[in-house]
A protein has these predicted regions:
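N-terminal glycine-rich phosphate-binding loop and ensuing alpha1 helix
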Residues: 9-28, 32-34, 65-129
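Conserved core of the sugar-phosphate nucleotidyltransferase
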Residues: 7-9, 20, 178-253
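ATP/Mg2+ or Mg2+-diphosphate-binding catalytic cores
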Residues: 284, 290, 296-298, 555-596
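ATP-binding pocket architecture of kinase catalytic cores
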Residues: 319-426, 439-447
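Active-site activation/catalytic loop segments of kinase-like enzymes and analogous catalytic loops
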Residues: 504-534, 547-565, 579
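Conserved beta-loop-beta/alpha segment of the NTase-like Rossmann-fold superfamily
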Residues: 132-202
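An alpha-helical support segment within catalytic cores of ATP-dependent transferases
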Residues: 299-314, 417-471, 475, 481-484
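Conserved alpha/beta core of the MobA/IspD/sugar-nucleotide pyrophosphorylase nucleotidyltransferase superfamily
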Residues: 13, 55-75, 222-306
Length: 596
């Protein structure tokens, strides 16, 4: 049974089931199918020969049995992801539950499925999984949790329910379909695309109506994500999913890789118009589809409107800024100028005093030290600053960058600015530890902590001079850009932890975030800061700070780990700094004492 024959059967069964759907002859059938009369005549003749139609375009018993055996069995809806591109509205609700015309997207999909008699619906959830629970009562759907949703792509979501794939629709949760894309009858496997050309699409529609896949294609038809997989092809797909998931290199793959790449599945193209199926992947796409959606009323959007005296329609080009260990930031444009909205991440209210941060920004205002600030809320930490176009972070492998950063840091320290709060490293070490819900994962933590805190005596003997210190003076927070005069300048950003402290702490912080593995690298940076004139006492003191700050951020990482956030090599290296530089500092202190 080829695609054309099945299309005719499906059209004629609809005529029998819907009195208002009238087809009296082949010409009317051709109009419904948007085919030529000659093609319809050819297909009808073949169906009659095969015993599926009589002379009056009426389905035979054989045809009805065939169609009854061609009913879809179930549906898998993929709804586990974060929806990162939906900033800022992805922070309170999964995008599957965003409302268009007062109905959540996923509810519209479920009801469209019910319209064609499909009630066996499985939803793969992950981010904010609890928000989907009500659907089990309202629609009798099944929820399956993908525990790896935060670190793997939707190939793994489909793998969680691969045993269910057989005569199955696979549907992404973020689509709004103006007309029902599902049917009571399906026979062959297909994947839905539209007529628009997408430069990043690896599939294109061939003359035979199939999809041709090639990663090397420069462009192809825009992929929607909806597919139907029949029982025969499902066997191949499930095997391919298993093969791909066995290799960690495929963690970021989409499920379509299993469908198209290195398989014998012939996938038909179901081509729709681009305005029939709309993907809602951003705040702006939702606004374009439903400008009255209640989801558009967002706290950060309201702040932007107030600060810049604009409406939400004036806010354009919104996209997430992934960098940042504690914050969820996004970039936006108002009146042709770009800005960054910083929204503090979960749990940061325990770690950062936003009133103190606001005090710091007021203190450094006018010194051309940091990015231009337009708004900061001392209560919730929401912040708007100018986005530096064509900027870049410090390259820790570039000696010129390192020298420039150390000069910027030294010039800032030489201002001797003061605020009314300090950053007490010893208190912070204990504070982060107090947030733990379990013992340290490091077996020798207690001894390591005792050793590192013992360095305080030497630091105090140096009588460090306190001034406003950045604390988080890491390479990523030094932004290089070209100013209006064509000269390169550096802005030091992200002052959340800043307070009164020995300014030499900033040197240690830069080193440990750079993950320097060799002592010579740290010595080189110290020499850049001091122009080669660092005293032995100051050098040892910085070694002490490397150990202390390593323990500090190791404790911070342990707290975040217990919340389910991992930082990989960074967290392991911080603990190593605590242990290794305690030894180095202790040895150098002994040498210094012998010289006295």
């Amino acid at each position: 049974m080829n695609m054309n024959k099945f299309a005719v059967l499906r059209m004629l069964i609809r005529k029998e089931q819907d009195r208002n759907f009238i087809i009296s002859n082949q010409r009317e059938l051709a109009e419904k199918l948007n085919w030529s009369l000659g093609l319809v005549n050819k297909v009808v003749t073949s169906l009659r020969y095969d015993g599926f139609l009589d002379e009056n375009l009426v389905l035979t018993k054989k045809a009805k049995i065939f169609l009854e055996n061609s009913r879809p069995k179930n549906v898998i809806i993929l709804a586990a992801g974060y929806g990162l591109r939906m900033v800022p509205i992805n922070q309170n609700k999964p995008k599957a539950l965003l409302t268009v015309d007062d109905k959540p997207l996923i509810e519209r999909q479920i009801e469209q499925l019910h319209q064609v008699g499909i009630t066996d619906i499985t939803i793969v959830v992950g981010f904010m999984k609890e928000a989907f629970d009500y659907l089990t009562d309202k629609y009798n759907v099944k929820l399956v949790y993908n525990k790896d949703y935060a670190i793997k792509n939707n190939l793994y979501s489909l793998a969680c329910v691969s045993d269910k794939i057989s005569d199955t629709y696979i549907v992404p949760c973020d689509l709004y379909c103006w007309t029902n894309p599902f049917d009571k009858y399906e026979h062959y496997s297909w994947y839905m695309v539209n007529e628009l050309i997408d430069e990043n699409s690896p599939v294109r529609v061939t003359r035979t109506g199939l999809l041709d896949y090639s990663k090397n294609q420069k462009s192809g038809n825009t992929m929607t994500g909806i597919a139907y997989i029949n029982a025969e092809d499902a066997l191949i797909l499930k095997k391919r999913i298993k093969e791909l998931c066995a290799d960690k290199q495929n963690d970021n793959e989409f499920w379509e890789t299993a469908l198209f790449e290195k398989t014998d599945i012939e996938v038909a193209a179901k081509v729709v118009k681009s305005n029939e199926v709309v993907e809602i992947n951003s705040y702006e796409q939702l606004r374009d589809l439903d400008c009255y959606s209640t989801e558009l009323q967002n706290d950060s959007i309201s702040v932007i409107c107030k600060v810049f005296c604009c409406s939400n329609e004036d806010i354009k080009d919104i996209y997430t800024l992934k960098k940042g260990m504690t914050n969820r930031s996004y970039i936006f444009t108002v009146k042709d100028k770009r800005y960054i909205m910083r929204i503090p991440g979960e749990g940061t209210e325990q770690l950062i005093n936003r009133k103190e941060e606001a005090e710091v920004y007021n203190t450094i205002k006018g010194y051309n030290i940091c990015d231009e600030l337009y708004y900061i809320n001392p209560d919730n930490g929401m912040k708007i600053s100018a986005f530096l176009d064509n900027s870049r972070c410090c390259n820790v492998l570039d000696e010129r960058d390192l020298k420039s950063c150390m000069k910027k840091l030294r010039d800032f320290h030489n201002l001797k600015l003061k605020v009314n709060h300090k950053f007490d490293i010893y208190e912070k070490i204990d504070f982060y530890e107090s947030l733990w819900t379990e013992k340290s994962i490091f077996q020798d933590y207690e001894q390591t902590k005792k050793n590192v805190l013992g360095l305080k005596a030497f630091i105090d003997s140096c009588k460090p001079e306190y001034c406003l210190t950045h604390i988080d003076a890491v390479p990523d927070n030094f932004l290089f850009s070209i100013n209006s005069d064509g000269k390169e300048e550096i802005q030091l950003i992200d002052w959340e932890y800043a307070g009164m402290q020995d300014s030499h702490v900033d040197i240690a912080m830069f080193c440990i975030y750079s993950l320097y593995k060799e002592r010579s690298e740290i010595d080189r940076l110290i020499d850049f800061y001091f122009d080669g004139k660092c005293t032995p006492q100051n050098r040892i003191k910085i070694y002490c700070y490397v150990a202390l700050c390593g323990l500090l951020w190791s404790n911070w990482c342990e707290y975040k780990r217990q919340l389910g956030v991992e930082f990989g090599e960074y967290s392991l290296m911080q603990y190593r700094y605590a242990k290794d530089y305690f030894k180095i500092a202790t040895e150098e202190i002994k040498k210094l004492e012998l010289k006295k």
